[in-house]
């Protein structure tokens, strides 16, 4: 078990900060490569307590929308988006 980053064609182990609210754009951009996704879904474990406005603004600067939700909801959303053929990346915090 652990946190993962899921791209449309690959999944990678991810070591984000222990607290999702301390996540910053520099924790993410190196994992996106040269082709930034239009959407980043962040599954924060349990119910999100922080709207993560600073991270959202930083991602928007790169043309990436941010959706923050529980990890189970992020998994469901990811599955729907992939079934629709959409491009997105999801970061899933391990559920403690």
Predicted feature locations:
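Structural motif
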Residues: 5, 40-41, 89-92
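Conserved mixed alpha/beta catalytic, RNA-binding, or beta-rich assembly cores of soluble enzyme
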Residues: 1-25
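Glycine-rich nucleotide phosphate-binding loop and flanking beta-alpha elements
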Residues: 12, 47-48, 96
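Long, charge-dense
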Residues: 71-82
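Mid-chain, well-packed structural core segment of small domains
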Residues: 31-68
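A polyampholytic, Gly/Pro-enriched intrinsically disordered region
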Residues: 84-96
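A short, acidic, amphipathic alpha-helical segment used as a generic capping/interface helix at domain edges
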Residues: 22-34
